[in-house]
Design a protein with these regions (language model features):
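Alpha/beta enzyme core
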Residues: 1-156
Length: 156
């Protein structure tokens, strides 16, 4: 028997972007005790405040900046996974950004597809949040990303 969940939408927030209901049937993933079934891919704070996703993945095609991560984390009512580079930005800078993101309250950090496996390993040595490795090609050696320390894969 399907559960009937009481709901309140209000008048002013009745235009929320709703994730498809079928997502509620998924098992999801549990991170730090919180089950996450839906993840919205956005850096738009208006979208982030008005979507019913369980989490946000915030990556963008510019050099990652702590101020941007902090803004998104502070505006969000749900866990945020923030980008820490891996393309033009990499190496020690990505490691420092990952540590700073953890201190800001990020639930995890996302590394871009071209990141060196050694940088994933370095990030894992300094943070206690998941490292999410972006996979953008069927030619990516997924096993090496996982062996380097990636906890979750973002296939895009």
């Amino acid at each position: 028997m399907k559960k009937k969940v009481p709901a309140y939408n209000g008048t002013l927030r009745d235009h929320t972007i709703m994730c498809p209901y079928c997502i509620s049937e998924c098992s999801g993933i549990r991170i730090f005790g919180k089950r996450i079934k839906s993840i919205a891919f956005s850096t738009d704070v208006a979208i982030i405040k008005n979507i019913n996703a369980d989490a946000i993945i915030a990556v963008y095609p510019f050099t990652p900046q702590a101020a941007i991560s902090q803004s998104i984390i502070s505006i969000s009512d749900v866990p945020v996974f923030v980008g820490v580079g891996g393309g033009l930005t990499g190496g020690k800078r990505s490691v420092r950004l990952a540590l700073q993101a953890e201190h800001q309250g990020a639930y995890g950090v996302v590394v871009n597809a071209p990141i060196a496996d050694e940088v994933i390993t370095e990030i894992k040595q300094v943070v206690d949040i998941p490292v999410i490795a972006t996979i953008a090609s069927v030619h990516t050696d997924v096993r090496r990303k996982l062996e380097a320390g990636a906890d979750i894969l973002n296939v895009s």
